[in-house]
Amino acid sequence: MEPAALIENFEKMLAAGKDNALLRFGLGNAYLSRGQPEKAVEHLTRATELDPGHSASWKQLGKAQAQAGRNDGAIGAYRRGIEAARAKGDKQAEKEMTVFLKRLEKQNPGQD
């Protein structure tokens, strides 16, 4: 399904009161794939609020923040995502976000 159709379907579900972390994650990903990182940040942030342990939401939030030019937000999201991945034992997600985090930290020294 095309991102535009996904967005339409997800937005209808949201309007009908079916708000949850996976819906927000899907909506954020769809907006990200359409080149709308600001909208993606909105929904992915909500996904992490609804399920702080969902490391994939943190990873995508970091990506969306970076695409929106908010490297400090991306760094924070990746750090939280790494914690969430470690807590779940998700080594692959932890490894990926660690790489993304190190790249951003090199580009933005002093973001401790």
Where are these regions (language model features)?
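Structural marker of alpha-solenoid helical repeat scaffolds
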Residues: A16, L50, Q67, A84-K88
